[in-house]
């Protein structure tokens, strides 16, 4: 099973994907996580370090693909999860999405994809261009990570539009659901997922332990083993892992038009707004 994980930059995709990968591995599955971001830090908490990227390895071997072995690309981290980082071109040049496609071709040529029960793509994706949409062509399911705010949900909707587009182009990828991350509330998330007719898979709260795990290079499951109070969060990831391993049919999301996105949440209770809907304004009194 191949799963592509998308979401707005900075929303916590990599932290979410890494903990999900470990949760799936703890269910006895062989897991590969492929980081698809030029920052190359998707797998940092699993590997505990920044691993060499595909771009760096290709350069090392002077782009002689036939000289590269799986062990040059694939590293094993916490929980037995294998990891790959695509890397990307220097800032301001080239196409990061192209590198993602080339990485998949290289792994297929090495015949390593079939070794795994679950492959997770962690993909850069605020507004999905053709290159970074490439994992959707291979994926069985897509997940979108979003916080409970408009900008993150706007990006999530654009990703849903990409899933719709891929289905129209003949690819059989479905949405597994939306994952709420860094959430103190879920009102906007619930409104959005109802509108796009897609499950809200799980909700991870905003907790200092998550931020610390990212900085220190640990997954939440490692922190749990160290005695940190993160059981509620690891339980949520285990729940989502079991949901994905149940092989849900998934859905083609009922993506919202761009203009409708700006109207969708107007009915939400926003007490900081005046009665005429403008921030800080008050209803004029009758003279």
Swiss-Prot record:
Gene3D superfamilies: P-loop containing nucleotide triphosphate hydrolases. Its cofactor is [4Fe-4S] cluster. PROSITE patterns: NIFH_FRXC_1 (PS00746), NIFH_FRXC_2 (PS00692), NIFH_FRXC_3 (PS51026). ATP binds at residues 10-15, 39, 181-182. Pathway: Porphyrin-containing compound metabolism; bacteriochlorophyll biosynthesis (light-independent). [4Fe-4S] cluster binds at residues 95, 129. GO terms for biological process: light-independent bacteriochlorophyll biosynthetic process; photosynthesis, dark reaction. Pfam families: Fer4_NifH (PF00142). InterPro entries: NifH/chlL_CS, NifH/frxC, P-loop_NTPase, Protochlorophyllide_ATP-bd. It is an enzyme of class 1 (oxidoreductase). Keywords: 4Fe-4S, ATP-binding, Bacteriochlorophyll biosynthesis, Chlorophyll biosynthesis, Iron, Iron-sulfur, Magnesium, Metal-binding, Nucleotide-binding, Oxidoreductase, Photosynthesis. Binds 1 [4Fe-4S] cluster per dimer. Belongs to the NifH/BchL/ChlL family. NCBIfam families: DPOR_bchL. Homodimer. Protochlorophyllide reductase is composed of three subunits; BchL, BchN and BchB. HAMAP family: ChlL_BchL. This is Light-independent protochlorophyllide reductase iron-sulfur ATP-binding protein. It comes from Heliobacterium mobile (Heliobacillus mobilis).
